[in-house]
């Protein structure tokens, strides 16, 4: 028997080699991988930059081996259309890392399935329909006003006897206004200061752990010796910390009577009581909304403000429009957005040049398909390089120039219909909160420009426009700027503490 099995071994090995050769045949070109590591040793911390450089060599569709996982990256609008529209059904699953993605029971990381459709429909009806967005409009406007008041109060407290103007950290106010808006939308209240600080600390730790586990999650044989590189105890402690925060800040809502419908979480808890959703799904869905909604919106606004400090003529043009349309006796509201075309273009230009997720979240092929004349095997990961497409000279004149006027010359949809600019994705996996995000970004940015003039703390000093590695495209150095109150801000009565 043993001799018989040994005699079959060469046949088995040859069969496996032939299958592997067939499986790899006709896949897109790309850098030559190394045994076991694939191309991981060649990857820069900013993956999108590596993919863009390889695309210049091998073409707009490439194969990259992330450890043992085949990854196909597309970097042109035409190929993005094929992935997100023409082959959307076959490429709507998610490639996910088990430790960091809620095991696929949430909305963001679940495969395309009846479960996903159910969660998306629930979120759309309760949070992201036009009716829901309009119902919560006053909430967003109140938070924008609170942001302006907070900046004014800090400017007053920061000015010493010499009346020297001190810079403000823009991210501080963006993080607060967006998180407060999302939390009130989700649970009907703002987080307390300690809850907010703990939430931010947990998110930062999660990004750090995700980065430290990258190689382990893609190279199967390293998992055998994972204790050399990564502490599972550290991750488990982080998971417990996140669960504790979630139960304290969110699930305490279970103590409220079911009839008290305050926020989206109340609806989820009703479904949990009815056994339609598990606690894990509720937790994952709420975490999706809090982290994705808060982080992605604030990131884009910070980049836009940095660009307008670099290019003051854009800032002045947006302010002139606001002064003409809104005046100086009141703050801008969401009802003003349709009659502020240049401000809308500023937001679109920021989304084009600085999408919050430069690599669209990874898709996974549920069956073998052909894209751009190449085979994408079943099980392959597929990335759309959104940043590269938004900066493609084939699509845009002077693509690295921040020039909102380009959107005045041509009506461009940024919510999934125009494949030259895809900040929210497209197709079945498109971000369901695209319209809400656009409204909030435009409102916050409009109030920042209407109420303050922004400039560099040191005249002539270059702003650090480098990017921080990670899933989100944060500015590596938080933006600091001088804020000079304008007429609209001076019309706001400050509350007495």
Swiss-Prot record:
Entry's Gene Ontology molecular function annotations: dicoumaroyl monocaffeoyl spermidine meta-hydroxylase activity; diferuloyl mono-(hydroxyferuloyl) spermidine meta-hydroxylase activity; heme binding; iron ion binding; monocoumaroyl dicaffeoyl spermidine meta-hydroxylase activity; monoferuloyl di-(hydroxyferuloyl) spermidine meta-hydroxylase activity; tri-(feruloyl or hydroxyferuloyl) spermidine meta-hydroxylase activity; tricoumaroylspermidine meta-hydroxylase activity
Gene Ontology cellular component annotations, sorted alphabetically: membrane
Enzyme nomenclature, EC number: 1.14.-.-
Superkingdom of origin: Eukaryota
Coiled-coil region(s): none
Keyword Metal-binding tagged: yes
Class of the enzyme per the UniProt entry, highest EC level: oxidoreductase
Tissue: Strongly expressed in inflorescence tips, young flower buds, seeds, stamen, tapetum and pollen.
UniProt similarity note: Belongs to the cytochrome P450 family.
PANTHER family, alphabetized: CYTOCHROME P450 98A9
Biological role stated in the UniProt entry: Acts redundantly with CYP98A9 as tricoumaroylspermidine meta-hydroxylase. Also catalyzes the meta-hydroxylation of the three triferuloylspermidine phenolic rings. Unable to use 5-O-(4-coumaroyl) D-quinate or 5-O-(4-coumaroyl) shikimate as substrates.
Protein's recorded name: Cytochrome P450 98A8
Organism: Arabidopsis thaliana
Name of the gene this protein is made from: CYP98A8
């Amino acid at each position: 028997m043993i001799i018989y099995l040994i005699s079959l071994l060469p046949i088995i090995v040859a069969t496996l080699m032939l299958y592997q050769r067939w499986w790899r045949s006709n896949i897109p070109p790309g850098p030559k991988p190394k045994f076991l590591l694939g191309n991981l040793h060649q990857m820069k911390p900013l993956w999108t930059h590596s993919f863009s450089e390889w695309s210049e060599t091998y073409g707009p569709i490439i194969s990259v081996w992330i450890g043992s996982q085949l990854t196909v990256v597309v970097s042109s609008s035409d190929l993005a259309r094929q992935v997100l529209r023409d082959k959307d059904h076959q490429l709507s699953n998610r490639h996910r890392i088990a430790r960091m993605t809620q095991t696929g029971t949430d909305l963001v990381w679940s495969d395309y399935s009846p479960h996903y459709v159910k969660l998306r429909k629930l979120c759309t009806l309760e949070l992201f329909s036009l009716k829901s967005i309009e119902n919560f409009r006053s909430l967003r406007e109140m938070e924008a006003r609170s942001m302006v008041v907070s900046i004014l109060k800090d400017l007053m407290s920061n000015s010493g006897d010499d009346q020297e103007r001190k810079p403000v950290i823009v991210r501080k106010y963006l993080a607060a206004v967006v998180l407060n808006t999302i939390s009130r939308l989700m649970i009907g209240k703002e987080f307390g200061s300690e809850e907010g600080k703990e939430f931010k600390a947990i998110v930062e730790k999660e990004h750090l752990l995700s980065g430290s586990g990258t190689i382990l999650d893609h190279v199967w044989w390293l998992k055998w010796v994972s204790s050399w590189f990564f502490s599972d105890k550290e991750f488990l402690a982080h998971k417990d910390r996140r669960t504790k925060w979630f139960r304290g800040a969110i699930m305490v809502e279970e103590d409220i009577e079911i009839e008290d419908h305050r926020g989206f979480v109340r609806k989820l808890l009703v479904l949990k009581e009815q056994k339609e959703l598990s606690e894990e799904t509720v937790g994952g869905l709420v975490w999706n909304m809090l982290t994705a909604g808060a982080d992605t919106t604030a990131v884009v606004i910070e980049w836009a403000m940095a660009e307008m400090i670099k290019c003051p003529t854009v800032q002045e043009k947006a302010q002139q429009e606001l002064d003409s349309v809104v005046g100086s006796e009141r703050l801008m509201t969401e009802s003003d957005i349709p009659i502020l075309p240049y401000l809308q273009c500023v937001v679109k230009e920021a989304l084009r040049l600085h999408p919050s997720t430069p690599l669209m979240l990874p898709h996974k092929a549920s069956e073998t398909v052909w894209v751009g004349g190449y085979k994408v095997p079943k099980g392959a990961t597929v990335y759309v390089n959104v940043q590269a497409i938004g900066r493609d000279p084939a699509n845009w004149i002077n693509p690295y120039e921040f020039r909102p006027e380009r959107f005045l010359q041509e009506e461009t949809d940024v919510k999934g219909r125009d494949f030259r600019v895809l900040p929210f994705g497209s197709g079945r996996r498109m971000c369901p909160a695209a319209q809400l995000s656009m409204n909030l970004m435009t409102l916050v940015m409009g109030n920042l420009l209407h109420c303050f003039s922004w400039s560099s703390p040191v005249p002539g000093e270059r702003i650090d426009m480098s990017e921080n590695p990670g899933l989100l495209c944060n500015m590596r150095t938080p933006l600091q700027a001088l804020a000079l109150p304008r007429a609209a801000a001076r019309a706001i009565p400050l509350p007495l503490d």
